[in-house]
Amino acid sequence: MRSDWIAPRRGQANVTQMHYARQGVITEEMDFVARRENLPADLIRDEVARGRMVIPANINHTNLEPMAIGIASKCKVNANIGASPNASNIDEEVEKLKLAVKYGADTVMDLSTGGGNLDEIRTAIINASPVPIGTVPVYQALESVHGRIEKHSADDFLHVIEKHCEQGVDYQTIHAGLLIEHLPKVKSRITGIVSRGGGIIAQWVLYHHKQNPLYTHFRDIIEIFKRYDCSFGLGDSLRPGCLHDASDDAQLSELKTLGQLTRVAWEHDVQVMVEGPGHVPMDQIEFNVRKQMEECSEAPFYVLGPLVTDIAPGYDHITSAIGAAMAGWYGTAMLCYVTPKEHLGLPNAEDVRNGLIAYKIAAHAADIARHRPGARDRDDELSRARYAFDWNKQFDLSLDPERAREYHDETLPADIYKTAEFCSMCGPKHCPMQTKITEEDLTELEKFLEKDSALA
C-alpha cells in the first residue's frame, strides 16, 4: 500500500515522520492515521512534530497500515510473539501474528531468541504483518555469539540494529538508558534485573567495566534510524520485577537517562516512545505515569502491565490488565500485553488470545475513562442489543465474538434461543430485562404520584 508514498523519499538523509511533520508536511501516513483515529490531520502532524505521538512506519515495511501511538489517539495494545530455542518455528510464529492481529493487536513485537534462523523468522513476520513490528536487537546479538555477549563490540551491536532496519522493523527496543553507575543500585532489590535486554547489556558492562555501548553510540543509532524511519522504543532495563522493587532509585535513575536520550533523538527528528514497568502496586501507578511524562517530556509511554500483585502465576493476564487499565487512564499511550503464561513459559495461540482480549478490555476501559470521543459508542450499542435480546448482535459487537457465542451456546445451542428473551442464567421466567417499562406506564405512574402527593 505504501510503495508509492515512500518512493519519493528514498535516498533522503532523513525520512522520519517527525522530520516531515516539523517541516509542516502532512504525509500520507499522517492522513491515513487521522482517518483511522477520526482526528484532524493537522493535529496528527502537530503531535508527531511535538514528540507526543509516534507513527512507527519503516520505509521498508511497505504493506504496513499506519497507526499512531500517543496521548491524543486511542490507547493501543502490543502483543509479543517469538520463537525460543526450546519451542516454536517460523510457521507457528506467523500463525501467532495472524491471531494477534485478528484479536486486535495494534503492534506486534518479535522477541525470537532461537527456534531457527532469526532473520528468516523476522522477515516472514514483517512480510505477513499489516501492523508495526518491533524487535529487541540485543537478542540477536546474543544469539549470534552463542551466548557470549562479552565478545560483541559496539560495531557488532550497530550491525544488528541496521540489519533489523533494512528488513523493515518499525521500532526497536534499545537498552541505552542502563549506565554503568546504575548497576550498584540494584543491590537492595529482590529480583535484580528482569529485563532480558537489560540483563544482556549488564553482562557486557560488568565484563568489560566500560559504559553501555548503546549509550556511548546512541548518536550512531540515531543516524541509522533516520535513514529508515525506525522509531526508538527506549528500553527500561531496570524496570521492577516485583512489587518490592517498584519505583526505586535504580528504576528512576534510568528513567532520567531515558528522558535525556529522548531529547537527543528529537534533536535529529527521530521518533521515540519510552518503555515502562513492570510490577507496580496500584497506589504507585499514577506516580509512575506522571514521572515518565515529566522526565521524558511527554514522549509516549509504553508499559508492560503493570502487574499489581505477584502471587498469581497462571493468571498474570488479569493481575496486569488491572494495572494496565489504570496506567491507560492516567495517560499511558500503549499497553504491552501479558499472557497467562507470563513467568511460566512460552505462550501458545490460546495464551495469545487470552492476553490480547484482557488488554483490549483494559485499553478500551482507559479510553472510556479518558472520555475519548466515541469511545463508549460500541458499549451503548451492545447494551441496546442486550436489552432487546438481540443475541447475534451482542456476539458481533463483543471483543471476542467467538467466545461470547461459545459460552451462550454451551447451554442453549439451538437457533431458536438466538431470539429467546432469556439466557440459561435466569431462565424464561426470571430475567429482569423482560420487564419493559413503557412511556405509557411512566405517564400513569407520574399521575398517581402527583395525586398521592396532593393528598399528602
Curated annotation (Swiss-Prot):
It comes from the Bacteria. Keywords: 4Fe-4S, Iron, Iron-sulfur, Lyase, Metal-binding, S-adenosyl-L-methionine, Thiamine biosynthesis, Zinc. Its cofactor is [4Fe-4S] cluster. [4Fe-4S] cluster binds at residues 423, 426, 431. The keyword S-adenosyl-L-methionine applies. It catalyses: 5-amino-1-(5-phospho-beta-D-ribosyl)imidazole + S-adenosyl-L-methionine = 4-amino-2-methyl-5-(phosphooxymethyl)pyrimidine + CO + 5'-deoxyadenosine + formate + L-methionine + 3 H(+). The keyword Transmembrane does not apply. It is an enzyme of class 4 (lyase). Pfam families: ThiC_Rad_SAM. GO terms for molecular function: 4 iron, 4 sulfur cluster binding; carbon-carbon lyase activity; zinc ion binding. Substrate binds at residues 80, 109, 139, 175, 195-197, 236-239, 275, 302. GO terms for cellular component: cytosol. Its EC number is 4.1.99.17. GO terms for biological process: thiamine biosynthetic process; thiamine diphosphate biosynthetic process. Binds 1 [4Fe-4S] cluster per subunit. The cluster is coordinated with 3 cysteines and an exchangeable S-adenosyl-L-methionine. Zn(2+) binds at residues 279, 343. Catalyzes the synthesis of the hydroxymethylpyrimidine phosphate (HMP-P) moiety of thiamine from aminoimidazole ribotide (AIR) in a radical S-adenosyl-L-methionine (SAM)-dependent reaction. Belongs to the ThiC family. This is Phosphomethylpyrimidine synthase. The gene is thiC.
